[in-house]
Amino acid sequence: ADSVMFCTSKGLGAPMGSLLCGSKDFIRKAAETRKMLGGNLRQAGFMAAAAEYALRHNIPALAEDHRRARELCGMLQDAQAISIPSVIQSNIIILDITGTRLSPSEFIARLKVRGLWLSESGSSHVRMLLYSGISDEEVRQAACILKEFLSEL
């Protein structure tokens, strides 16, 4: 690929913003297109400063999020009725819940009342996302909540 775009507000924790990287010609064309579509933004320096801070200071925290995701998967390896990915490369875990015979929305609703929030990721999958606001203890609690719920099915 000759270009890449990434969001600074997700794992890096900036309040908003994305970076588009590529050749000077590509960036010039992208800026023109953005302006034509009404996406021009004035006084954006404060957002750029927050994104720059996140790039300079928050990258090490991503490794912690990834570690917690791997640990959570390890805690769930023996859980019933779900399939856990064998390799976790980020802070996102996609669980196959086909074995529960619940729809993703029902699965999510039942866990939400127990204090565990997930999101849908297709017709038979749910997504768990770990971020810097989640502690090691909360990861252990999430595993316990999920395993207890699955044992009751």
Residue spans for each PLM region:
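A short, conserved structural fragment
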Residues: 82, 117-118
